[in-house]
Amino acid sequence: MSAPSPYVWTFQPQRGTAAGASQDYSTRINWLSAGPELRGKVVQLNEARNAILMKEQESVPTPRAEANPSFWPAALIFQPRPQAIPVHPAHPDTFDAALTSNGAQLAGGAWINYKNGSVRYEAPLQLAEEQVGGPLNAFAIKHQLQLAGGALSASMSEMSGAPRIPRSGGIGSWQFSREFPPTVYLNPFSGSPDTFPHQFLSNYDSFSHTVDGYD
């Protein structure tokens, strides 16, 4: 008997909930081409995978009575504050300083002033036409580097995967990926039909808690 395939949860971004789970049949054995030796190796790999997933299931905290509620109060939503990501120059500081002193710039930038026969760059170093603001130089670029666009954004919430603040109707993809790992359900048909978890059915509606065609 082969190891059961894990159930992989699906994220519903409009509602901010888990939209049910379905089995990952990509791990199933092709019985037409698999011999006894290959079948045994695949079964061992699947059993090892299930052991890892079951251990992960036990370690995932679920501080709520219902694993997948249809409405998420704000107290149950984890909203991490995005951290700033400094961008360091690709070359040593001496190399960047030498290029700046010789008037090197990319795609626009400010004017270069000539004083006493030397070239001095007296504007914020940037990679676009728009000013980034603030007295910058090659040594302070790591916190102000930008690529062809507007001014720096004060928040990186659009890239963090966290829900926009304030939000009280659903979770974000960051929280979903950590609280809904692939689930291994052993012996799914050992009990009566009403004991089978509805969220593992492909036509389960997590919002109304009903199964299409059955309820």
From Swiss-Prot:
Disulfide bonds: none annotated. Keywords: Capsid protein, Host nucleus, Late protein, Phosphoprotein, Virion. Residues 110-150 form a propeptide. The modification Phosphothreonine is found at residue 62. All late proteins expressed from the major late promoter are produced by alternative splicing and alternative polyadenylation of the same gene giving rise to non-overlapping ORFs. A leader sequence is present in the N-terminus of all these mRNAs and is recognized by the viral shutoff protein to provide expression although conventional translation via ribosome scanning from the cap has been shut off in the host cell. Belongs to the adenoviridae hexon-linking protein family. HAMAP family: ADV_CAP8. This is Pre-hexon-linking protein VIII. The gene is L4.
